[in-house]
UniProtKB/Swiss-Prot annotation:
Main function: Plays a role in neurogenesis and neuronal migration. Necessary for correct formation of mitotic spindles and chromosome separation during mitosis. Necessary for cytokinesis and cell proliferation.
Quaternary structure annotation from Swiss-Prot or TrEMBL: Interacts with PAFAH1B1. Interacts with PLK1. Part of a complex containing PLK1, NUDC, dynein and dynactin. Interacts with DCDC1. Interacts with EML4 (via WD repeats).
Signal peptide: none
Protein name: Nuclear migration protein nudC
Species, as recorded: Homo sapiens
GO molecular function terms listed in the Swiss-Prot or TrEMBL record: cadherin binding; unfolded protein binding
Family matches, as SUPFAM superfamilies: HSP20-like chaperones (SSF49764)
Biased composition (Basic and acidic residues): 75-97
Keyword annotations: Acetylation, Cell cycle, Cell division, Coiled coil, Cytoplasm, Cytoskeleton, Microtubule, Mitosis, Nucleus, Phosphoprotein
Cellular compartments per GO CC: cytoplasm; cytosol; microtubule; midbody; mitotic spindle; nucleoplasm; spindle
Modified residues (Phosphothreonine): 108, 145
Short sequence motif named Nuclear localization signal, residue ranges: 68-74
Domain CS stretches: 167-258
Effect of residue 326 to A: Abolishes phosphorylation by PLK1
Length: 331
């Protein structure tokens, strides 16, 4: 039978026809067979039973395709569910270890590398400060430092993101990627939590988490809208409630979970921790461009758009050597 493009050839016409059948698929099928009966010799033109055989074969073919599609969809959903459960369990384990007091923690290679980078940056900052006191740095360096301090003035007081690009707060911990957010809320109770003990209400722009009969741990307006039907929550180890939220806008970092939370400095977020591989190619290229432009701006270098303009200008100047651009001003 025909390929996908051939199958979709009459979709517009059939969809318009289907929308005029208030009785649904049954009425649409009846109209189709009525057309075959009245306008063709489908039922009487061939041998006995040929029409019925053709209908049965066609139904069997498309039924197999439909069942295959449904199985593949279920497999994808199950894989996503397992991934979310594993992520929630990992988050709950981290939250539980943090509430159980100081412990020796073995760092992963990535965490160790990031920690070493922070130590090196701190040493560089100390050396820089010492050089400033000794007067060994020239005035342009001092001017750059003052400009950086002025630029970051509005970010003073904001929290530094945790390793998951979220925040570690007194009563809960949250992490995020561009497309989703995970939250772990540990409860200090002397019994194993069950679903009936909890009040978890996920709405498009509001979240509430707490114990029944107790003041809610979280009860506020979310930073932005979430897909309620794709969000979920569960209880880990009988002590920690984990919540998974799917963002509607997958092109932004949240600076807080709910409006009552302190803000994190989204400029210090590490984009590499997010799952760019989960995004479609178009969205991924846009995000990578945003990340590149952000890095360029932080270093005082031209963005990708500015680089393109410079290349076009340079090409034009090369093609017109007779023109004098020395006194020209470019924006």
């Amino acid at each position: 039978m025909g390929g996908e493009q051939e199958e979709e050839r009459f979709d517009g016409m059939l969809l318009a026809m289907a929308q005029q059948h208030e009785g649904g698929v049954q009425e649409l099928v009846n109209t189709f067979f009525s057309f075959l009966r009245r306008k063709t010799d489908f039922f009487i033109g061939g041998e006995e039973g040929m029409a019925e055989k053709l209908i049965t074969q066609t139904f069997s073919h498309h039924n197999q395709l439909a069942q295959k599609t449904r199985r593949e969809k279920r497999a994808r959903q199950e894989a996503e569910r397992r991934e979310k459960a594993e992520r929630a369990a990992r988050l709950a384990k981290e939250a539980k270890s943090e509430t159980s007091g100081p412990q020796i923690k073995e760092l992963t290679d990535e965490e160790a590398e990031r920690l070493q980078l922070e130590i090196d940056q701190k040493k560089d900052a100390e050396n820089h400060e010492a050089q400033l006191k000794n007067g060994s740095l020239d005035s342009p360096g001092k001017q750059d430092t003052e400009e950086d301090e002025e630029e970051d003035e509005k970010d003073k007081g904001k929290l530094k993101p945790n390793l998951g690009n979220g925040a570690d707060l007194p009563n809960y911990r949250w992490t995020q990627t561009l497309s989703e957010l995970d939250l772990a809320v540990p409860f200090c109770v002397n019994f194993r939590l069950k679903g009936k003990d909890m009040v978890v209400d996920i709405q498009r722009r509001h979240l509430r988490v707490g114990l029944k009969g107790q003041p809610a741990i979280i009860d506020g307006e979310l930073y932005n809208e979430v897909k309620v039907e794709e969000s979920s929550w569960l209880i880990e180890d009988g002590k920690v409630v984990t919540v998974h939220l799917e963002k509607i806008n997958k092109m932004e970092w949240w600076s807080r979970l709910v409006s009552s939370d302190p803000e994190i400095n989204t400029k210090k977020i590490n984009p590499e921790n997010s799952k760019l591989s989960d995004l479609d190619s178009e969205t991924r290229s846009m995000v990578e461009k945003m990340m590149y432009d952000q890095r360029q701006k932080s270093m005082g270098l031209p963005t990708s758009d500015e680089q393109k303009k410079q290349e076009i200008l340079k090409k034009f100047m090369d093609q017109h050597p007779e023109m004098d651009f020395s006194k020209a001003k470019f924006n």
